[in-house]
Amino acid sequence: MALLNQVRASTTVPYEGYVEARGRIGLPDVPRAGRVVALLGETTRMRAYVAGPERWRVDELTPIGERDLYHEPWGTTLWDSGERRAVSTVGEAAVRFARPADLLPPELGRRVAAAAEPGEARRLPPRRVAGVEAVGLRITPRSPETTVGRVDLWADPRSGLPLRVELTARGAATPILTAAFLDLRRRAPAPDLLRFYPPDDAEVQTDPSPDLAREIDRFSPFVLPDLLAGQPRRTRVARAASTYGR
């Protein structure tokens, strides 16, 4: 399907915009699991400035301040305006916790489109999103093992950039995760917006990239099988930490 391929190819499309993501996924509060529970169970408000896959900035807006994530080819910098602290991380681990930027409609939409198989996608009626008459697509996974019932997305007809994504669990009537632009400017952000300039009172530190998979492999006596719950292992080497399925 042409629209599906257009969504997959939209990784280099620049944009600026305001996004709201609403999650209704109930997860237990796991210690040291980052902000995964809040991201998937609450409303996350973000401003996004994206020049491309290697240079972007996403500001998470909270009642007490902002948490701004700057991504450049060398790594990332997280600035917490409430704590007045900046942490730069060199590189990026193969396995990491979810972060607000993962909930942007283009990120969610492209991830789903990349995993879709032939015959799983069909067109939906258009929908107006952030001032754009967006074209719709429904992806319904065929695998009986998945808990995802369907994913509906609407994209910019010119660029294929996903503007709204709704994920509905199997057997559910309403989405458990929705992410959508409320405001969108289809242009490249100014270079200065993508560079972090620490304030004079900021505490600045640099951390190595946390490789969770490596730490699990280091201490676990177990190696996961090639097949788990009917899904093949995606990682090439058998390890204690692996990913499976699509």
Each language-model region and where it sits:
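N-terminal leader/targeting segments and the immediate start of mature chains
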Residues: M1-R55, S88-G91, V95-R128, S209, ...
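Extracytoplasmic
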Residues: T12, T43-R45, P53, I64, ...
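One face of beta-strands
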Residues: Y15-A21, M46-A48, E54-E60, R67, ...
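Accessory, solvent-exposed terminal regions and/or long lumenal/extracellular loops of proteins
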Residues: E42-T43, R195-R246
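Short, mixed charged/polar active-site loops
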Residues: T43-R45, E66-D68, A86, V148-R150, ...
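Short, solvent-exposed coil/turn segments at beta-strand boundaries
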Residues: V50-W56, H71-T76, G82, V132, ...
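Gly/Pro-enriched, hydrophobic low-complexity segments
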Residues: D59, R122-A202
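Long, acidic/polar, low-complexity amphipathic helices and coiled-coil-like
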Residues: I64-E66, P73-D156, V165
